């Protein structure tokens, strides 16, 4: 069963890891996702989207404070879907949103990519931060 009460499916593999909240850890997140989802057809998309959420955690939340960090949860239903959740120190009130950056801007496209490539995505506040997730279905 999934770890999420709002979604009843049979999850065949679940992986969780905590990462320090530093920029260099985004590369570690990418490698972690690639390792755990190596046989998932959309592994490239899952890796990219997870790195975008991890980057947001490090750049826009208290997850980057000394001693803080963020968690990555991967739920994989073989041959069907993957759901990745990034649990960071984000605000209870400030939800992430898809920005409309200027055409020549170097930043602000992370959630645009998530919105474009994921089957679904969302974010909700918890008592310990914010969980932002995406789903990719085959």
Question: Language-model segments: what does each one mean?
Answer:
Residues 1-16, 58-138:
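Conserved beta-strand-loop-beta-strand hairpin that lines the nucleotide-binding pocket
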Residues 1-48:
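Bergerat-fold GHKL ATPase/HATPase_c domain
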Residues 41-66:
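Conserved ATP-binding N-box helix of the HATPase_c
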């Amino acid at each position: 069963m999934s770890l999420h009460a709002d979604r009843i499916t049979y999850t065949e593999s679940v992986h969780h890891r905590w990462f320090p909240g530093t920029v260099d850890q985004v590369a570690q997140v990418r490698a972690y996702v690639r390792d755990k989802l190596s046989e998932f057809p959309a592994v490239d998309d899952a890796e990219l989207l997870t790195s975008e959420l991890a980057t947001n955690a490090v750049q826009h939340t208290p997850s980057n404070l000394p001693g803080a960090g963020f968690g990555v949860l991967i739920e994989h239903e073989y041959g069907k879907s993957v759901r990745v959740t990034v649990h960071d120190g984000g605000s209870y009130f400030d939800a992430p949103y898809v920005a409309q950056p200027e055409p020549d801007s170097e930043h602000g496209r992370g959630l645009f990519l998530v919105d474009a490539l994921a089957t679904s995505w969302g974010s909700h506040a918890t008592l310990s931060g914010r969980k932002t997730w995406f789903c990719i279905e085959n």
